[in-house]
């Protein structure tokens, strides 16, 4: 399996969205940038902030679209084309309603599952053959409450659980970057 060359965090731009559940993907890549002592740089032709981090002996691009979630594909496709990266070499970190806060899972391929950022990416790519980091944010219990839920801020307890999940995901990232996706999944998905 090909190793990773690009990690994307999904979220919505603007200070009013910074701490929302929907920005779990941004939280993941922001954590990587901070941990590695890097800085985001605006790359207007990619409609994104970009950074590079050194993981598992190689440089990996990080991309944080400046478009809203439902238009993320434009930025991602621009990045893939500009850096000549195959979708199979990309990991997209996003919020996941189907998992409780604190749960985090890796997945390769599939549909969008109702996640609007993934919907736009798969539409523009024409397929879903890329890696995903699914960060649990919980579900409000009824589909009519989903929009307010994802655009709302997690509770203190939920934030602690989400942060712990992002730390666990960061710990297996060297395996993912090196192309050992199965081992990364085994470590991340095994509850000790």
Swiss-Prot record:
This is Peptidyl-tRNA hydrolase. The record marks 12 as: Discriminates between blocked and unblocked aminoacyl-tRNA. Belongs to the PTH family. Signal peptide: none annotated. The active site is at residue 22. TRNA binds at residues 17, 68, 70, 116. It catalyses: an N-acyl-L-alpha-aminoacyl-tRNA + H2O = an N-acyl-L-amino acid + a tRNA + H(+). NCBIfam families: pth. InterPro entries: Pept_tRNA_hydro (IPR001328), Pept_tRNA_hydro_CS (IPR018171), Pept_tRNA_hydro_sf (IPR036416). Coiled coil: none annotated. One of its GO terms (cellular component) is cytoplasm. One of its GO terms (molecular function) is peptidyl-tRNA hydrolase activity. Its EC number is 3.1.1.29. It is an enzyme of class 3 (hydrolase). Keywords: Cytoplasm, Hydrolase, RNA-binding, tRNA-binding. It comes from the Bacteria. SUPFAM superfamilies: Peptidyl-tRNA hydrolase-like. It comes from Xylella fastidiosa (strain 9a5c). The record marks 95 as: Stabilizes the basic form of H active site to accept a proton. HAMAP family: Pept_tRNA_hydro_bact (MF_00083). Its main location: cytoplasm. GO terms for biological process: protein quality control for misfolded or incompletely synthesized proteins; rescue of stalled ribosome. Hydrolyzes ribosome-free peptidyl-tRNAs (with 1 or more amino acids incorporated), which drop off the ribosome during protein synthesis, or as a result of ribosome stalling. It is found in: Cytoplasm. Disulfide bonds: none annotated.
């Amino acid at each position: 399996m090909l190793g990773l060359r690009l990690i994307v965090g999904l979220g919505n731009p603007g200070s009013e969205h910074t701490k929302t559940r929907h920005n779990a993907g941004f939280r993941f890549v922001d954590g990587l940038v901070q941990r590695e002592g890097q800085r985001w740089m605006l790359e207007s032709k990619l409609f994104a902030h970009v950074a590079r981090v050194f993981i598992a002996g190689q440089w990996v691009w990080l991309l944080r679209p400046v478009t809203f979630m439902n238009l993320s594909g434009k930025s991602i496709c621009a990045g893939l084309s500009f850096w000549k990266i195959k979708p199979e070499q990309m990991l997209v970190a996003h919020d996941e309603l189907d998992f409780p806060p604190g749960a985090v899972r890796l997945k390769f391929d599939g549909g969008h599952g109702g996640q609007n950022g993934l919907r736009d990416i798969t539409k523009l790519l024409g397929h879903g053959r890329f890696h995903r980091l699914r960060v649990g944010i919980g579900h409000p219990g009824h589909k009519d409450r989903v929009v307010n839920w994802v655009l709302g801020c997690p509770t203190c307890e939920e934030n602690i659980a989400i942060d712990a999940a992002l730390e666990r995901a960061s710990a297996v990232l060297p395996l993912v970057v090196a192309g050992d996706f199965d081992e990364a999944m085994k470590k991340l998905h095994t509850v000790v």
